[in-house]
Amino acid sequence: MIIDVHCHAGKGDGLTGPWDTAAPLADYLRRATAAGITHSVLLPAFSSDYARANRELAAIVAGAPHRFWGFCFVHARHDRGRVARLVHTAITRYGFVGIKVHRHDAPISREICDAARRHRVPVLYDVAGEVAPVELLATEYPDVAFIVPHLGSFADDWRAQLALIDMLVRHP
């Protein structure tokens, strides 16, 4: 079984790039199938309204639950005070299995980590090159699984990647 744990799907409400405009799955599924990928974790495209984006993603996941697993997207700043409710809805109503957070939106918060702990789900946190908080996450939330994509830097910042590798060695 090969799992792709980082695939955006659906429509965002921005127009700056594919990450916030539209992430259709047809071409992706063709390539994934050819590569032997049997399951995909889907994440909503960037949006100014992640509650809506999560609902839309739930419909996509429900269309092929044997193939797709959903992670809800939350915004640490805009969703402050309602993260627990958003995550609870995503896990219990939509059947999602994790949380997605992006540093581009705002730094991860205790509210998000506490929701992950409460529901016992992983957090996929794109740190966007800011790897220092990963050590704090490892020590403050040792019982929460954190997935740090792109080796800590989408832009291939080797300094950030080496720093992340060092932290991973110290906090396996």
Predicted regions and their residues:
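Short, well-ordered coil/turn segments that N-cap beta-strands
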Residues: 1, 36-40, 64-70, 93-97, ...
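An N-terminally biased module of ancient metal coordination in phosphate/nucleic-acid-related enzymes
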Residues: 1-56
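Active-site neighborhood of phospho(di)ester-bond hydrolases with catalytic His/Asp-centered motifs
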Residues: 2-5, 41-44, 71-72, 100, ...
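Catalytic metal-binding/acid-base residues of hydrolase active sites
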Residues: 8, 102, 152
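Alpha-helical scaffolding within the catalytic cores
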Residues: 23-29, 51-60, 84-85, 131-136, ...
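N-terminal cationic-hydrophobic initiation segments that often serve targeting/anchoring roles
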Residues: 32, 61-65, 91, 138-139, ...
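Active-site gating/metal-coordination segments in enzymes
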Residues: 47-125
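Catalytic pocket-lining loop regions of alpha/beta-barrel enzymes
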Residues: 105-172
